[in-house]
Amino acid sequence: MCIRDRAEIVNQDAVAVTSAIGMFEGYEDGSFGPENVVTRAEMAVIICTMLYGAGVNVNQFAETSVFTDVPAWAQGYVNLCSSLGIVAGVGDGKFDPNATVTTAQAVLMLCRALGYFQSATDFGNDWMLAATAKGTALGLYGDLKLTANAGLTRDNVAELVFNALTKAVPVQYNE
């Protein structure tokens, strides 16, 4: 992908790799938009692509929506992530798909995609603290300096996902 705003990208390797494997696409003007925020719906798409590859067919998950506020383009991805226990709603049957994903939410989603936090009791009373600690232990943050409640940019999400792919160890279950 030819990126017009390459000089603005901090996490060059992460953006190059995650873009090459289909997690991110550039914009029509040739930019990547490294400072643009990632929504909760977009994060679900990224997670599905991380787990199943670009072009993952989510049509069977788009037929009935788990949440009442998810747009059609994202329904399959959000529903698949929900069925895997990777994402949760915000209450009243809502997902809040257009809200900016926070660091803590994205790290929790990545940890769950790697097999951690499969039960609500896995993180005790404070899911945010538990996700942050597990994300740190797994090396998801790398050199990123992020706060738990801060919204994430495309540049930073690329780095978190890149680290999940290259540094983190997925849970291994014994049969």
Predicted feature descriptions by range:
Residues V15-F24:
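Mature N-terminal segment immediately following signal peptide/propeptide cleavage
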Residues R4-Q12, E25-Q75, S83-A104, L110-G151, ...:
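Feature responds to low-complexity, polar/acidic, surface-exposed segments characteristic
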Residues R154:
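Extracellular structured ligand-interaction cores
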